[in-house]
């Protein structure tokens, strides 16, 4: 899975690109002048996530399948925990928790193991978890929130 940015990303967008790719055990790449076809070639037959900007800050995630079809997009504002600086990413795929249309879209796109909300406490302490709520998506590691996307919009194509 490839995570990339807009053509001229800000420092915050590059940071989110790196964090997201490390969290989902994917690859991060600076886009530069590449078009969609070239990005799909670099994705090596896998799905693609493009981080777009709004006023110089990361503000949209667009999710593409292997053929380059846009599946869905999220508009958001981001938040980072101070715990993030000292967190070591294991490279293991995270688990997925949550209900609703966005959680279902994530399940289809990522193919991560789904965990029921009432079973989150039973996960091993070193687990990474994506918790999809109605208003936010929380990326958790070792039981703590590492970064969060506060949702502003969701569009399915």
Curated annotation (Swiss-Prot):
**What Gene3D superfamilies has UniProt attached to this entry?**
Probable brix-domain ribosomal biogenesis protein (3.40.50.10480)
Disulphide bond pairs: none
Instruction: List residues of the Brix domain.
Output: 1-157
* GO molecular function list: rRNA binding
User: Could you provide one GO biological process annotation from this protein's UniProt record?
Assistant: rRNA processing
Report keywords, A-Z.
Answer: Ribosome biogenesis
InterPro entries per the UniProt record, alphabetical: Brix (IPR007109), Brix_dom_Rbsml_bgen_prot (IPR023548)
Q: What does this protein do?
A: Probably involved in the biogenesis of the ribosome.
Which NCBIfam families has this protein been placed in?
PRK00933.1-3
Q: What is this protein called?
A: Probable Brix domain-containing ribosomal biogenesis protein
Q: Could you tell me which species this protein originates from?
A: Methanosarcina barkeri (strain Fusaro / DSM 804)
